[in-house]
């Protein structure tokens, strides 16, 4: 196959092989998501307190391949000299090692089952609930199967650093076959840059690379401060192992499940990056013989990459990267075929061992999200308040200017095959994306770390770029919007070579040996990705009337407040509540990741009903007080290791390992309903005006990340166009309305 790198083309025209038929919708599709969970963008927060039980609930008794390339077991902590938390803004230097935080507890069985029923009640019919309650009671009865499994879980807790980590990782990520873009990998959009030329863009890219390697070195030598809790149980240390994995992990497709690889045992090979431009791939050295290249030397290599591609007159490279966006088991099969060629094995190893991927993209056309832009304009003309669904109204009036929704599509999936989706390698943890018009960001593979860890690293990287530490003479392009102080990275520890770049390193073009079978698979992957991209309904809502400062003055947890607003918006859209996911960080425990904060409770349902029928003010306020107090209690339970979902997952998997028949609690329809998250949410706070978004986790659901700033809130809303029941436009309107009404409800207490 021959491709012209200087023009865009329809990939399908170049293939005459077998075409895969479009998959037909199937009711069974929903079942794929019942245990998939969420993309777990972790909210850091900590509280103290005793186990909280639902109001009015009866008491229940309960017993107290390293790069050959094989997956590496997680380690609870590693020797460090220091460690930080910009999340908590509280730090303590630890001269010897990270503190050994406690193990994640196994919650009491009765506690978990009681809360499970509390969350089931508002999402089941009364007859279904009674049936589910009987099944739960049977499972939890004294000397019953639940207690037997619980006893084995406690033994597992005593034997392992984290009793649920491997089960959770498999269930939420590695066993899920869905494509990574939209379904798993979040996209992060940075503050908009002003590039006067390609050289400006390249300088910014070099700074991203240099600052990332600075951060990687700090992680390796233990030069981070220990993340610590900032609320109740203040200063309690948090587990730091997620930082270790950000620049040294790779998600390899495999059968029957993916593998999360570590390259820490191959440190000498983990000193380069891979650069994509117009689907061409290059290896670019950053450390040579133990010495870091200078800013000018890295810049020269990146300039050479762009020059070589723009002047290239040979056959176009096969767009192998598009296959990383396909179904994971399909990509695993394709990878096996690729690896059958020795040259391809070398290229795969280069990609798998790189520190990060750098993608120079073509900007998506403004028409890409024209339907969203048009509906935004229509929405804005109907409103006279200062709330809007975009950064600036003028963006919508200027059809030649890309908006941030367009940029969000660019970071999440690349826009499809004929745009940039093949200019990616979605398996790699960190992919920086840059475009000539100044929209830059990140697409990151989620299995190795939570969003807050990645965001903290990225914000320190962006702040270091804005500082004098990394400014080179004659370079004026600095990030906008970084107004809050973040620790500036220290000077790099590697010695810098000053030798001419030609004598140190030049970019190496990565060549693939592609068979007709792989050509057909690339075509099929392009078809699949394009359908996925076309199906995504994505929208940014900037709510400008107030932010977290108002919520705090109203003596409310901002997170609980926003969760109630999301519930009210969903209730207005659909006339009911739904199983809701919000990630809750469990990093105060060893190898902690996240549990699920659920907002679907009878108390929230009662408040939503009162709001919709415009009940008397006193009634609405009283029910709000009850609902938000309970929501805060649920948050407390989760971050203290008393969540429901992780424990149920452990009970289910432990039963399998014991060889027991599947308990009815896990086969009953109520369990499927409980895990069908039509509302998948997460708080992703940033200091700069950056934001992170993702797709829904079920076909008839919404994705809703939120970033509460002091005086405004940024929501990233997503749904699927193929679902007639969902609409981000309508959901966004009802979310604005909910926030307006909640302000009216609480204004009297705010001084």
Language-model segments: which ranges?
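Long, Pro/Ser/Thr-rich low-complexity/intrinsically disordered regulatory tracts in eukaryotic proteins
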Residues: 2-5, 10-428, 437-438, 445, ...
């Amino acid at each position: 196959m021959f491709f012209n790198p200087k023009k865009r083309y329809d990939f399908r025209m170049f293939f005459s092989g077998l075409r895969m038929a479009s998959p037909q919708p199937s009711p069974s599709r929903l079942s794929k998501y019942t245990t998939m969970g969420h993309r777990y963008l972790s909210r850091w927060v900590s509280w103290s307190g005793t186990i909280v039980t639902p109001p009015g609930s009866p008491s229940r008794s309960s017993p107290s391949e390293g790069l050959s390339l094989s997956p590496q077991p997680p380690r609870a902590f590693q020797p460090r000299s220091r460690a930080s938390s910009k999340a908590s803004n509280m730090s303590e230097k630890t001269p010897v090692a990270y503190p050994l935080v406690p193990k994640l507890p196994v919650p009491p069985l009765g506690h978990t089952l009681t809360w499970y029923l509390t969350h089931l009640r508002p999402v089941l019919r009364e007859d279904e609930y009674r049936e589910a309650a009987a099944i739960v009671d049977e499972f939890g009865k004294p000397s019953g199967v639940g207690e037997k499994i619980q006893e084995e879980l406690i033994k597992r807790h005593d034997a392992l650093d984290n009793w649920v980590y491997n089960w959770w990782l498999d269930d939420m990520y590695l066993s899920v076959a869905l494509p990574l873009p939209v379904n798993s990998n979040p996209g992060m959009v940075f503050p908009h840059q002003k590039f006067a030329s390609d050289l400006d863009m390249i300088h910014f890219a070099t700074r991203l690379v240099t600052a990332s390697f600075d951060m990687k070195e700090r992680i390796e030598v233990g030069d981070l401060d220990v993340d610590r809790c900032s609320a109740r149980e203040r200063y309690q240390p948090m587990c730091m192992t997620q930082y270790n994995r950000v620049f040294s992990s790779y998600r390899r497709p495999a059968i029957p499940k993916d593998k999360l690889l570590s390259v820490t045992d191959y440190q000498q090979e983990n000193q380069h990056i891979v650069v994509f431009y117009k689907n061409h791939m290059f290896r670019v050295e950053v450390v040579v013989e133990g010495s870091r290249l200078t800013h000018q030397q890295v810049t020269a290599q990146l300039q050479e990459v762009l020059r070589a591609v723009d002047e290239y007159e040979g056959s176009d490279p096969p767009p192998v990267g598009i296959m990383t966006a396909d179904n994971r088991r399909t990509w695993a099969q394709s990878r096996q075929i690729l690896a059958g060629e020795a040259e391809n094995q070398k290229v795969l190893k280069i990609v798998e061992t790189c520190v990060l991927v750098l993608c120079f993209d073509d900007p998506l056309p403004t028409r890409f999200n024209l339907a969203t832009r048009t509906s935004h304009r229509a929405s804005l003309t109907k409103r006279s308040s200062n709330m809007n669904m975009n950064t600036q109204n003028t963006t919508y009036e200027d059809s030649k200017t890309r908006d941030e929704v367009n940029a969000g599509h660019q970071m999440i999936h690349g826009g499809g095959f004929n745009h940039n989706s093949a200019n990616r390698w979605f398996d790699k943890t960190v992919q920086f994306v840059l475009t000539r018009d100044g929209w830059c960001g990140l697409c990151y593979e989620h299995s190795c770390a939570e969003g807050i860890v990645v965001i903290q690293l990225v914000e320190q990287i962006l702040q270091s770029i804005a500082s004098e530490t990394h400014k080179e003479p004659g370079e004026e392009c600095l990030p906008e919007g970084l107004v809050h102080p973040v620790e500036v990275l220290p000077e790099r520890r590697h010695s810098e070579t000053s030798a001419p770049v030609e004598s140190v390193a030049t970019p190496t073009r990565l060549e693939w040996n592609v068979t007709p079978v792989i050509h057909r698979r690339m075509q099929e992957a392009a078809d699949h990705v394009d359908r996925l991209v076309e199906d995504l309904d994505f929208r940014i809502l900037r709510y400008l009337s107030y932010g977290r400062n108002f919520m705090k003055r109203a003596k409310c947890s901002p997170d609980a407040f926003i969760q109630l607003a999301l519930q009210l918006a969903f209730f207005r859209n659909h006339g009911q509540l739904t199983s809701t996911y919000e990630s809750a960080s469990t990093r105060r425990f060893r190898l902690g990741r996240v549990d699920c904060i659920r907002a679907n409770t009878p108390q929230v349902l009662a408040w939503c009903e009162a709001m919709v029928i415009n009940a008397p003010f006193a009634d609405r306020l009283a029910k709000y007080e009850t609902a938000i107090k309970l929501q805060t209690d649920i948050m407390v339970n989760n971050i203290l290791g008393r969540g429901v979902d992780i424990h149920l997952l452990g009970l289910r998997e432990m039963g399998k390992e014991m060889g027991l028949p599947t308990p009815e609690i896990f086969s009953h329809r109520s369990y499927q309903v409980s895990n069908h998250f039509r509302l998948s949410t997460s708080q992703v706070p940033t200091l700069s005006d950056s934001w992170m978004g993702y797709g829904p986790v079920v076909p008839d659901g919404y994705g809703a990340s939120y970033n509460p700033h002091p005086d405004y809130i940024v929501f990233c809303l997503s749904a699927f166009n193929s679902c007639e029941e969902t609409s981000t436009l309508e959901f966004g309107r009802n979310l604005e309305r909910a926030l307006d009404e909640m302000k009216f409800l609480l204004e009297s207490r705010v001084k």
